[in-house]
Amino acid sequence: VKSTNLMAFVATKMLERQEDLDTCTEMQVEKMKASTKARLRTESSFAPRTWEDAIKDGELLFNGTILQAESPTMTLASVEMKGKKSPIDFAPSNIAPIGQNPIYLSPCIPNFDGNVWEATMYHHRGATLTKTMNCNCFQRTIWCHPNPSRMRLSYAFVLYCRNTKKICGYLIARQVAGIETGIRKCFRCIKSGFVMATDEISLTILRSIKSGAQLDPYWGNETPDIDKTEAYMLSLREAGP
């Protein structure tokens, strides 16, 4: 009952900030809300209460606090059993992630030099993401560049850290079945619940495969270091995706 009340409270509050959620996270919260209502109906035989009552009880239970995950693998329910609490704050940068979305709280590494050998690789279906720095921005800037070696088979997306204006990742998206799921899973490895900001070319391509994106004003007044980007992409292509 306590878990159900908490989930009702969290789902309701997160959906009140719907404009701060990307499409994938919004769908997860909606599913969370639907499953919580189903649990509420099941519990009605021994703990009858309305949805509104569950929301109020969930808020009162923690005295205006919300559980916050300690690691990417912990869900809201698993943290609840540990009894951890933190002040409730539904500002855009503090919405608690759902499921296994990572939480990033530390700042970006200031002395990143673009070296590839410390990169972290993520593979999901037709998408391969190379994360090259501990970039903890909640919103990424992407520059799309067709992969010359596989022009008709894939697209390459270079991700920039909005704090340092340096490369923070590199995504290869092949045109295969299920690529939307693959891209979403890759993005969820490095961000938490926010819309992907892109340039105009990337926006068109991402929307063509139904991945949530929005234009970024950064591209209207600044230009990335194209030479460094080209050299970086070339080194990745030579090393293989």
From Swiss-Prot:
Chief place of localization: host cell
Compartments reported by the entry: Host cytoplasm; Host nucleus
GO cellular component, one term: host cell cytoplasm
UniProt keyword terms in alphabetical order: Host cytoplasm, Host nucleus
Physiological role: Suppresses the RNA silencing-based antiviral response in Drosophila cells.
Protein name according to UniProt: Non-structural protein 1
The gene coding this protein: NS
